[in-house]
């Protein structure tokens, strides 16, 4: 059968998946352990090809109900352009609006399950088909050594790279179960109900699961935390890192901290400790989130008030969210990619010296534009200028090495406008396209701009 479908190495087909599953049930290979898979004739030709086709098709099929539930929930909330919600930059306008009015934040690292069987146990609460769970266990045995008691981070990394779609489905199911319980308690313990909790479209019949939640509370939490009442509690997450912010006292944050640790340990059987959740005061510490350093600072301003014939100044100091480019981690990423050394001095890129001049310049410009696009929301542009300088000089040294010259001599031979694009701002393109653009429009683009077409962190920016 595999020889008949030899052209499906790089694609998934539901027909191929169906035929493979049928063959597996006919030949009864599901009962063979992972240790005997080398002698298994089912895997005799290409074991990875079978597993990849099956798991890809499996992930596609189980994603369909979640996608339909997403569409229905967004239509019910009258959200039309939900594609913009995919952008990670859409988180920052929310932070700008809410965080200046908050006092404390908790940096939360969501722990990975110690064993992949925990993911299966998490899904069994919402999946009633036993064959579904057996097939899921079969995939996990093929991708990892399930005889091991602990799954290391290296094993998880290999597992996620071998089949990212299948891994994301399992991980999102685990996160969904955790957040559904967490936000359910958050809504029950607050004076004000959260209207944004409808985004958790993955929940299956939440209010029909009250009995299950009651069982969780009775077994894991003898006292329901009804005292955790804070209408100014906000929660944001990206991948495995989340932030819990509040306007209340640190006592409430420490109570939520203990609750989360107990939730992971008692309900999900995931080892966690209090050190994984750090509580900081927003006015004194920066948040390392989405490759930005964000902090709340006072923005002093003098406002002149006019009452009848008298006028007098008023000192106003509202809080403002600062988003800063993390220069030291970013230089470390550039050094790892061989654009500079450890202290930020530009060096030539040896692997690109055999390309044409146009290709070398174009690749450096592509990296520079991507970084500028991602860090367009920075409130201070000075750090971004330094990154552009490193990339510009690295490009010059690469070209000079190719032409067997020095950087100074090479710059004298080329036009002064040769590298002008390295210093062109985002707003500079607006001035070139619209020469008569108003001063207000240019001022708008000289400030912070959040782009809703960015759905993942830039590779060089991802220093976490």
Curated annotation (Swiss-Prot):
Its main location: plastid. It comes from the Eukaryota. InterPro entries: Domain_X (IPR024937), Maturase_MatK (IPR002866), Maturase_MatK_N (IPR024942). One of its GO terms (molecular function) is RNA binding. It is found in: Plastid, Chloroplast. GO terms for cellular component: chloroplast. Signal peptide: none annotated. One of its GO terms (biological process) is RNA splicing. It holds the Pfam family Intron_maturas2. Belongs to the intron maturase 2 family. MatK subfamily. Usually encoded in the trnK tRNA gene intron. Probably assists in splicing its own and other chloroplast group II introns. HAMAP family: MatK. This is Maturase K. It comes from Castanea crenata (Japanese chestnut).
